[in-house]
Amino acid sequence: MKQALRVAFGFLILWASVLHAEVRIVIDSGVDSGRPIGVVPFQWAGPGAAPEDIGGIVAADLRNSGKFNPLDRARLPQQPGSAQEVQPSAWSALGIDAVVVGQVTPNPDGSYNVAYQLVDTGGAPGTVLAQNSYKVNKQWLRYAGHTASDEVFEKLTGIKGAFRTRIAYVVQTNGGQFPYELRVSDYDGYNQFVVHRSPHPLMSPAWSPDGSKLAYVTFESGRSALVIQTLANGAVRQVASFPRHNGAPAFSPDGSKLAFALSKTGSLNLYVMDLASGQIRQVTDGRSNNTEPTWFPDSQNLAFTSDLAGRPQVYKVNINGGAPQRITWEGSQNQDADVSSDGKFMVMVSSNGGQQHIAKQDLATGGVQVLSSTFLDETPSLAPNGTMVIYSSSQGMGSVLNLVSTDGRFKARLPATDGQVKFPAWSPYL
C-alpha cells in the first residue's frame, strides 16, 4: 500500500481545484444477482463519530462490482467488531458465507489505524480468510477502505480489485469563462478535481499506463492539438498540432508509444509516436477514414475504427506493417473499441436497428453480447481488471456517465449536477 500511496500522492497537488458537485453512483439494476456477503460497520475506537464510514465504503465497492450483494445494515444479525465475535450460524442462516469486520483506531499523532478481517462463516468460529491493517492520515481513509475492498474482492473472486482506480472525463459546464473542464475523480466519483479548464472544447482523455499522465485533445490554439499533461505538476507537452484533425490518443501498454489519428494528408489515418524520441510514423494509409485506436496487450497491434467497408467497423493492424483485418461482423456498424488488458475481449459502440449500445465481443470466438440499455451510448472504457465498463450516454438534453458490468448484469449511473459529462477514461491500477 505504501507504493500505491506514493503514486496517488501526486494527485493531492490538484485537490485545491475541487470546487464542483461530484458525481455519485446511482445503482439501476443487477445487485440482487450478486453473491450475498456481510459487511459490518467498522468499530470506531475514538471519541464522537467516526471520521469516515469505512464499512460503508467496502460495502459500496463490493456492490458496485456487480459481483456481490451486501446485506442491508438493518438486516445484519449482529455487529461484531472482530473475527472472534462473529457467530457463523447467525450468518449462515441468511445464506452468507463470508463477513467483513473491521476497526478504526485514532493515533496520538493524528493518524488512524484501519484494520479488517474477512471471516469464513462456513468454517470454525473465527476462521479468517484475509486480513490487513493500514496506518493512514485522515485524507487517506477512503483510500484505505478501497484497499480493503480490493483485497477482499481478490480473495473471493481471484480477480484483482480495481477500487483504487480513477476516472478522467470532460465536463461542459453551464456557462462561465472556462466552460470545458477535464476532471479526475475516484472511480466512484469522490475526490473530484480539475486537471485543466478551457474556453474551448476538450476531448478524448487517455491515461498513461503508470497513471501519471493524461493525453487529450484541446482546441486552444485555434485548431485541434494533442497534448500530454503530467498530473503531479501540471506540465504540458504538445504532441501533435498538424493541419486539420489531431485526435484519439492512446498510450501503448508498455508506455513507450502514443497512437493517434491525423488527417493532415486528407483522410484520417493512424500514426504512432515514439515518446522518447518524438519520432512519428504512419500506420494506415488510403482513402478510408481510420481512427479511434486502442492497443492490444503486446503494444504492437491496434484495434481501430475504419469505414473501409462503407460503414464504421473495427479492424486490427500491426504497427510494423501489414494489411488491416476486419474483426467485427455483427450489427450495421461498430466503433470506438477498447481491448481488455488480457486481450481476450473488447467492448465497443455497436449500432443495429436504430439502437446504439455498448457491446462486448469475444476476440477468440467473435461472439457479441450487448451490455447496455441506455440511449445513444458512446466512448466505452474498461476497468483495468475487465469487470466493468464506464461510458457516456444521452439523458434528456445532456450527457451522463454510466457503469455496466462486462457480464451485463449490473448497471449504474454517475449523474453530475453541474454540466454534461463526456469522454470517460478508466485509469490503470494506481
From Swiss-Prot:
Q: Which GO terms describe its biological process?
A: cell division; protein import
GO CC annotation: periplasmic space
**Record-linked Pfam families:** PD40 (PF07676), TolB_N (PF04052)
Principal cellular location given in the protein's record: periplasm
**Which keywords are on file for this protein?**
Cell cycle, Cell division, Periplasm, Signal
Annotated localization: Periplasm
Q: Where is the signal peptide?
A: 1-21
PANTHER family with a match to the protein in the record: PROTEIN TOLB, PROTEIN TOLB HOMOLOG
* Protein family according to the UniProt entry: Belongs to the TolB family.
Q: What does this protein do?
A: Part of the Tol-Pal system, which plays a role in outer membrane invagination during cell division and is important for maintaining outer membrane integrity. TolB occupies a key intermediary position in the Tol-Pal system because it communicates directly with both membrane-embedded components, Pal in the outer membrane and TolA in the inner membrane.
Question: Which NCBIfam families does UniProt cross-reference here?
Answer: propeller_TolB (TIGR02800)
| Summary of subunit composition and partner proteins | The Tol-Pal system is composed of five core proteins: the inner membrane proteins TolA, TolQ and TolR, the periplasmic protein TolB and the outer membrane protein Pal. They form a network linking the inner and outer membranes and the peptidoglycan layer.
> What is the protein name stated in its UniProt record?
Tol-Pal system protein TolB
Q: Which organism is it from?
A: Shigella boydii serotype 4 (strain Sb227)
List the taxonomic lineage. Answer: Bacteria, Pseudomonadati, Pseudomonadota, Gammaproteobacteria, Enterobacterales
